[in-house]
Amino acid sequence: MPDMRLPIQYAFSYPERVKSSFERLDFARITDLTFEQPDTKRFRNLALAYEALYRAGNMPCIVNAANEVVVDAFLKDKISFLGMSDVIERTMGKVAYIKEPTYEDYVATDTEARRVALSLLSS
């Protein structure tokens, strides 16, 4: 049964590839697929992404910038995996929301969100 073990292995071993014992997924042999509702309580970053999409405006830009900052910090062992969501959520609350941003607003939002996320990491 497919699950997230292989994509997670790829993420942790990047840019190298670790040989795995996972059976290859053969779509020709699959008779049916089952999809479940994502658990946004368990996967907080997914809930934050949905919130950003719902709010629209520059919010997805804020989430993306904060996420890039925390992923980099995580890869450098400067933040825990579970701590990443806190920084993203706090960045969402601190950077000014713009309902109908211009291109210049997006550029400024990205810069500000990165600055805020970095300052939250160092506090």
List PLM regions with ranges:
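Catalytic, metal-anchored helix/loop core of enzyme active sites in primary metabolism
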Residues: 1-123
